[in-house]
Amino acid sequence: MRNIQIALTKGRLEKHVIPLFEQIGIDCSELKNKGRKLVFQSKNTDISFILVKAVDVATYVEHGVADIGVVGKDVLMENEKDIYEMLDLGVGVCKFCVASIPTYNPKSYRKKRIATKYPHITSNYFHDKGEDVEIIKIEGSVEIAPILGLVDAIVDIVETGKTLQENGLIVFEEMYSISARMIVNKAALKTKKDEIFSIINVMEQEILSGK
């Protein structure tokens, strides 16, 4: 078996994904005791892992540094990459939502200002609804933007809604459901087809058996 390099997202999604790889027999002990390391070799296999920021997973896969990647659907929607999206892993499930302070009127005809970390997704969503909005990109906590009057509403990923609630915001619209996706480099799918599909097929069966 030729070596397969898998790019994973650091943080919350990583904790959801590691158990899936363990369930299909891939050793992830180094990943679970990583310290500050970012590159790991799975014991007794030709599989290695790299840990990078979510937005970089698709970039590493697109350019062939990683053969396989696991990343949230939000990253793929916001950043168009030349990769294959192969499998919905069904973990890390969240929703894109429009949220604001209780006095926000989503049916108002005046042009709205929307704060978000995801301008591409937000622009497409409101364009499809036929609404003209001004989008302000915020890199930090977007929840404060409507509270301070910078914008009318925000678009953000909501998992439990606790952060919104703590800041006095409510969800006005649920836009899209998102989850972790397995992606593959296009060239690698030709040159390492058997190795890649051996992982994808077993992973898919594991997911289906767990439903």
Curated annotation (Swiss-Prot):
A GO term for molecular function: ATP phosphoribosyltransferase activity
Pathway participation: Amino-acid biosynthesis; L-histidine biosynthesis; L-histidine from 5-phospho-alpha-D-ribose 1-diphosphate: step 1/9
Top-level taxon of origin: Bacteria
Keywords from the named record: Amino-acid biosynthesis, ATP-binding, Cytoplasm, Glycosyltransferase, Histidine biosynthesis, Nucleotide-binding, Transferase
Transmembrane regions: none
Catalysis: reaction(s): 1-(5-phospho-beta-D-ribosyl)-ATP + diphosphate = 5-phospho-alpha-D-ribose 1-diphosphate + ATP
Pfam families assigned to the protein according to its UniProt record, in alphabetical order: HisG (PF01634)
Localisation: Cytoplasm
CC annotations in GO: cytoplasm
Subunit structure: Heteromultimer composed of HisG and HisZ subunits.
Protein function: Catalyzes the condensation of ATP and 5-phosphoribose 1-diphosphate to form N'-(5'-phosphoribosyl)-ATP (PR-ATP). Has a crucial role in the pathway because the rate of histidine biosynthesis seems to be controlled primarily by regulation of HisG enzymatic activity.
Domain notes: Lacks the C-terminal regulatory region which is replaced by HisZ.
Name this protein carries in UniProt: ATP phosphoribosyltransferase
Organism of this sequence: Bacillus cereus (strain ATCC 10987 / NRS 248)
